Amino acid sequence: MPLADVFSLLVLGQGKSGLDVARWALAHPERVNAVTVYGGGTSEPNDATRALEAAGASFVYGTEQVEGAYDVCVTCPGISEFSGFFKAGREHAAQIMGEPEFAYRLSTDNWIAITGTNGKTTTTSLTDYLLKAAGEASVAVGNIGEPPINEIDGRAHNEWFVAELSSYQIATTTELHPRVAVLLNITPDHLGWHKSHKNYALAKIKLFDNMVDDDLVVVDVEDAGIHEFDEYIYTPGRRICKVAFDEPEGEDAAFVRDGKMIVRLKGVETPVSYTHLRAHETDQYL
């Protein structure tokens, strides 16, 4: 469901991304006609929330019992989708989502989204660097630095966002559609938020849900944690680039042959020169 031209906004949580969403909304009264922030059960006023209140936002502190009706609810990533607070937001808003999903719906950029239990920040930095080196307008966002919402204004159509996304953030997406999505690895993590390892893994894999055959899913096929969930990854119409040290089958792959990295896209191989990389660095460059 697209965002309305004008909508009322509910924000759950007063962490950085939640306050940044509220700040963006207040700066865009042509889009957002009311901003309400529920800070959470232990929340209290602070300098940042007072400044937003002075600018026109309404804050409710010390409770997770939401009242009222809203067009859009944006939740902070620390609020589990299985929590009573999240449920309250969903019951009182026509749509609920996390900050990356909200920013995606407002942006005109191409997105590259990178997730995994380990290695996200390094891979995001490398990807952003390579795009810039190729002359593309790119910005790294998400867990690596600024929330995407802080970077969407003033950008030309079809520039690039390189987003480092956690399982929390992906779990609260529905329409996020990266042009490229990277899954580095899966090991058990954040079980308190997701309630099970399977939920955690499927939240990561949810990143691929809206991708089509002219997008590119990049997966480390030698990671045992990823391999456990192959049935959810290899679905019809999904184009997958298999990453491995040993050469994998398929038209799309990245691997090492005779000491050089090889990238194969749609059957066409391109050697990528590199020297003096340690094993873990090679993995991240792949």
Protein language model regions, located:
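Phosphate-binding loop of NTP-binding sites
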Residues: 2, 6, 67-68, 77-221, ...
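Conserved small/polar residues in nucleotide/adenosyl-binding loops
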Residues: 275-282
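Short polybasic amphipathic segments
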Residues: 253-255, 259-266
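A short, charged helix-loop
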Residues: 269-271
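Short, hydrophobic beta-strand segments that form beta-sheet elements in well-ordered domains
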Residues: 35-39, 217-220, 242-243
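N-terminal leader/targeting and accessory segments in enzymes
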Residues: 1-98, 102
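Cationic, low-complexity basic patches in intrinsically disordered or flexible, solvent-exposed regions
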Residues: 285
